[in-house]
Every structure is written in structure tokens, then in C-alpha cells.
């Protein structure tokens, strides 16, 4: 009961953001069920839309200040990257009380199905996720990899060449960036 009371009355927005991905995996089934109920009730709570928008924007700004991109291809931390995508998803989940899936790709698809995200959002997020994995293998410094590695990355991602990869990445970041840039007014409506 103390956890439920804390979540209802005292928890900060960032704590509720973390709950959007929570999934009890250990313990007695009764206890896991009770925890799942508390999480679901917490996530479904009505929220002050202006406060949510303010908190989300401040958190992302603080993160950008304290953890800047490490290179030209840091698709996780660059504007329009995976962190922006995650903030968009979680902000919409908390504001509208729906699409709660611990897996971000499934959450994005659910938000698309409800009309809260555009069709291109999930493919953009998926491309950046696949690129992030590939770059960690061939360019861990998040800089442009050597030409032989560029060809490997392009092929693995289903593109003819590196230029196509970069064009698709720019388009994906544009989609995510547009959603992030428009998040505050959408949360307040």
C-alpha cells in the first residue's frame, strides 16, 4: 500500500515515465499481479497537462545538457534521435493514459493506431534503432565509419549504399524531431 500511495501522491513525473516500461518479473504471482495493478492505476491517473509538458521538456533539456551527442552519428542522443522518440512516446502515454507496452516499438505502434503518432514514426524509430546497433559494432565513436563498414551497414539496413542510409536517417530524424518539437502543445490539449 505504501508504494501505491507514494505513486498516487508523491512520485515525480520521471518516476511515472519509468513505470511506462515496468514489468514485474520475479516474486509470487499474487504480488506481481498486485504490482501490475498499482502500475496500471498509476499510469491511468489523470494528470495536470501543463505540468506534464513542463516536466517532460525540462527533463529532455537537462539530459541534452548533461549528456550531449558523442559524434555525428549518435542517433541515440542527436536531436530527432532515439531519446527524443522515447520522450515523445512516454509523454503521450502518460498524457492520454494508453498504449502502455514496455517495448517502445509496440508502444509506438499502439500510439499510431490511436492516431496520436503519424504512420512514419515507428519505421523511423526502427531504422534508428537498427542503425544504433550496427554503429556500435563498426563505429563505436559515433563518427562516420570507413567505406568498407559503410557498405556493410547499408546492406544490413537494406539500402543500396551509404548515401541512401544517410538520406533515410535524415528523414527519420525529421519525423521524430517534428513530433518532439510539437509535443508541448499536444500535451496541453
Language-model features: locations:
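A nucleotide- and high-energy phosphate-metabolite-utilizing enzyme signature
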Residues: 1-189
